[in-house]
């Protein structure tokens, strides 16, 4: 029988790291603030002292709409949590001189770019999505695609 999960029994695979995709910055900062406070409360000898767990990253876009993912710090051996809010339509980008809101598909593409930029170096990657991408479709009708299932397969195959 497995033991009950609690914060004291949960062990990270390595040092914690957080990455916010575009549109998830505020949520990631709230999570980071709570983690820093919690680490300070359980840190007896000062070895866990950390000001932030957020890793500097970016998903810039070119004027034709193409994008790329960039991670500015090493993730080797870290327990990485990537936070992605695919339902945030408040994020815009410049597309041939016009500001265009990001769609859930573009948020998901940025998530995959960040995972690729991590280059399989973290010890573990966990994706946190407040709203599951394409999660509104609960059954197949006719010849429809099952995008949520496809997305989960893609993320699983990425490692």
Feature-to-residue mapping (PLM):
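PRPP-associated nucleotide enzymes
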Residues: 1-159
């Amino acid at each position: 029988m497995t033991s009950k999960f609690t914060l004291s029994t949960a062990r990270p695979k390595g040092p914690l790291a957080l990455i916010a995709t575009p549109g998830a910055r505020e949520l990631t900062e709230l999570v980071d603030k709570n983690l820093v406070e919690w680490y300070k409360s359980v840190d007896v000898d000062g070895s866990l002292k950390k000001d932030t767990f957020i890793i500097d990253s970016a998903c810039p876009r070119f004027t034709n709409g193409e994008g790329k993912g960039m991670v500015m710090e090493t993730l080797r051996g870290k327990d990485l949590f990537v936070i992605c809010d695919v339902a945030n339509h408040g994020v815009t980008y410049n597309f041939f001189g016009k500001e265009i809101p990001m769609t859930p598909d573009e948020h998901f593409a940025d998530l995959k770019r960040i995972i690729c930029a991590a280059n399989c170096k973290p010890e573990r990657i966990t994706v946190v999505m407040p709203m599951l991408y394409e999660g509104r479709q609960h059954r197949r009708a006719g010849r429809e695609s099952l995008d949520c299932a496809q997305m989960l397969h893609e993320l699983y195959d990425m490692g």
